[in-house]
Amino acid sequence: MYQRDCTTITQHAMSTPDGLYDIIEFTLCTINMPLSRVIQQRVSIKAEGIQSKWVSGTKALGIEYAKANAQRLHAAINEIADLHGKDTIDGAQEAVDLFVSIPSIGMVKAGFIAQMCGFQVACLDRHNIRMLGLAETALVLNKKVKPDLRRSKIRSYVKLCR
């Protein structure tokens, strides 16, 4: 079931800008929220947009950015897949780097979006981080750091996921 569902999700995300937007919005809805509440949020967002009670200011920025940039993000993620492959460290690093540009999306959630696009990376939650003996802050990425440091931290995260 896992492989079947992952394949379906990847096809949805990579086929159209709307499909990619869909998984980005889904990811935004999972931030600090149990999965059981995601459907409720998505229904509300579809009906009320960023005026939904579920949408905070930062989540609204992410939703608006993803909507406005869906075509560019979709073209970029497909270009990354074509250039680097989905099963390489370079491909996963580039995918995560692309998605951290979305407001409200940190490195871990960017990994989740990239994973749903078929790249070999994941979304390591607090429980996984603790099991690995790392501090939760180890995976926090300051988006204002220099590009070389950002890319290095993303690459380390991708390797950790493998």
Locate each region found by the language model.
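Short, amphipathic alpha-helical segments that act as regulatory/interfacial helices
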Residues: I24-M33, H74-A81, V158
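Structure-specific DNA junction-binding interface
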Residues: M1-E64
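Short helix-capping/linker segments at secondary-structure and domain boundaries
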Residues: I31-Q41, I80-K86, F119, E136
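Alpha-helical ds-nucleic-acid-binding substructure associated with the helix-hairpin-helix region
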Residues: Q40-P103
